[in-house]
A protein has these predicted regions:
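C-terminal catalytic "cap/lid" subdomain
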Residues: 1-235
Length: 235
């Protein structure tokens, strides 16, 4: 029995690097595809947004001589590359996936609309939504929150390298305390940087819970969906 029928999974681009310093690690990509395939086979309607930080981060472009708008546009294209890679990996698992883009770029992907994305989900296809919001100055966390709300997901799953939300950086502070659940209000008060403020506000105002968990631990995604107590729920 699955806990959620429709979800939005946010993956970071950096996580696709695996142990490499750049690009896409094929092993990590295939591990993610296997985990996502398990969900689809359980009947979970799955939307996905992937970052592009393994290829290019828009904000970092400003330090390399690009203006912010151009840098963010390059970052959007990086998310499309990652989305195409994940789509191919899913097809190798015999899972149908459709890539949507927030900027028109047919035939690379379909131009995104809420209706088309929901139609794909209802057919049991994975809807991979790329190119952020299509606008500069917005992070892929904000794009994930927006797409989760638009596609009427019950929860946004934020797959990271850590196993939840802590009171401080667990890699730097041995006394950091892990939360099983925490309210958006407390996230604000404690200044915990789970997502940027725009994304957090969007989730809070639309009553969209966020579950932060370690995606790199094989099997965790399925555990989340079958109700095992892992990660941190932000509500």
């Amino acid at each position: 029995m699955v806990k959620y029928k429709r979800i939005l999974l946010k993956l970071s681009g950096e996580s696709l690097m695996g142990n490499q310093g750049y690009g896409i690690d094929e092993t990590r990509l295939n591990e993610y595809a296997e985990q996502i395939a398990e969900l689809v086979k359980l009947g979970v309607q799955t939307g996905i947004v992937i970052g592009g930080g393994n290829i290019f981060r828009g904000l970092s472009g400003t330090g390399k001589g690009f203006d912010r708008v151009k840098g963010d546009q390059m970052g959007m294209l990086a998310t499309v590359i990652n989305s195409l890679a994940l789509s191919s990996a899913l097809k190798n698992q015999n899972i149908q996936a459709r890539v949507f883009t927030a900027i028109r770029m047919e035939p690379v992907g379909e131009y995104y609309s809420k209706e088309k994305a929901i139609e794909a989900l209802q057919k049991g296809e994975v809807a991979i939504i790329s190119a952020g919001t299509g606008n500069p100055y917005f992070t892929t966390d904000t794009a994930s929150a927006l797409r989760a709300v638009e596609t009427e997901a019950e929860i946004m799953l934020k797959g990271t390298r850590v196993d939840g939300v802590y009171s401080a950086d667990p890699e730097k502070d041995p006394d950091a305390q892990k939360f099983d659940k925490i309210s958006f209000a407390e996230v604000y008060t404690r200044n915990l940087r789970i997502m940027d403020l725009t994304a957090t506000t969007l989730c809070q105002e639309n009553n969209l819970p966020v579950l932060v968990f370690n995606m790199d631990q094989k099997g965790n995604l399925k555990k989340v969906l079958t109700g095992e107590n892992i990660g941190t729920i932000v509500y």
